[in-house]
């Protein structure tokens, strides 16, 4: 199988960024919305000036104005803007045109998720499919029914499709059986609320081993 793209999200300190920058992740994510992992654009700019990051950088937003997202994206030179709220396809299209960034739409695993993928598909570059947990936009560490992964990827064909929720070193091989194109995680590589180098390495080792055996 092809190795999935890997995104480490919810980076919230200089130390987190230093560890993630040295990891095998392809994407690093910062959350600019209300969350226990929320960071300020000003702090992120300082950290990015101190750490050499040779990865794609994503900013996560929830129901933020297009003007604010565009300003932050340009200031931080974001590669990806991830929309995690109630944004509409027209918002994604406008943001894409204004910033030149890749636009990803986060969707929750629900009965209508494939229809939502179809609704957004022409206006975004990728999707993040996460668990549906009442009162939460993501970062819960709860997995959804991964047997739905092939269906979602088929619906999103031609676009990036990341799977989030409940991914950690112990569950990674179960997810890999469904051949996800991308994996997005935050709490699964954290210890005491901070990114943990040992958990990152363990997850990467298990993923690499599974992929090499499956080739």
Curated annotation (Swiss-Prot):
State the family it belongs to. Belongs to the TrpF family.
Q: What is this protein called?
A: N-(5'-phosphoribosyl)anthranilate isomerase
Picking any one GO molecular function of the record gives:
phosphoribosylanthranilate isomerase activity
**InterPro entries per UniProt:** Aldolase_TIM, PRAI_dom, RibuloseP-bd_barrel, TrpF_fam
Alphabetical UniProt keywords: Amino-acid biosynthesis, Aromatic amino acid biosynthesis, Isomerase, Tryptophan biosynthesis
PANTHER family, per the entry: N-(5'-PHOSPHORIBOSYL)ANTHRANILATE ISOMERASE (PTHR42894:SF1)
Instruction: Give the originating organism.
Output: Bacillus subtilis (strain 168)
Record-listed E.C. numbers: 5.3.1.24
NCBIfam families, from UniProt?
Answer: PRK01222.2-1
């Amino acid at each position: 199988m092809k190795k999935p793209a890997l995104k480490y999200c919810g980076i919230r300190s200089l130390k987190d960024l230093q560890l993630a920058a040295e990891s095998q992740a392809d994407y690093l994510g910062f959350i600019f919305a209300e969350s226990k992992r929320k960071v300020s654009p000003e702090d992120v700019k300082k950290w990015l000036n101190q750490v050499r990051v040779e990865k794609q950088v994503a900013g996560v937003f929830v129901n933020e104005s297009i003007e604010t997202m565009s300003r932050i994206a340009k200031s931080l030179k974001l590669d990806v803007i991830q929309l995690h709220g109630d944004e509409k396809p027209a918002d994604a299209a406008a943001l894409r045109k204004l910033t030149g960034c890749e636009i990803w739409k986060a969707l929750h695993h629900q009965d209508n998720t494939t229809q939502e993928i179809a609704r957004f598909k022409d206006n975004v570059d990728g999707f993040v499919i996460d668990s549906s947990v009442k009162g939460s936009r993501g970062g819960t560490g709860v997995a959804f029914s991964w047997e739905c992964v092939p269906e979602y990827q088929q619906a999103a064909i031609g676009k990036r499709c990341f799977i989030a929720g409940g991914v950690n070193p112990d569950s990674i091989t179960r997810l890999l059986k469904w051949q996800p194109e991308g994996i997005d995680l935050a709490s699964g590589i954290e210890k005491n609320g901070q990114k943990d180098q040992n958990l990152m390495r363990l997850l990467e080792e298990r993923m690499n081993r599974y992929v090499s055996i499956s080739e």
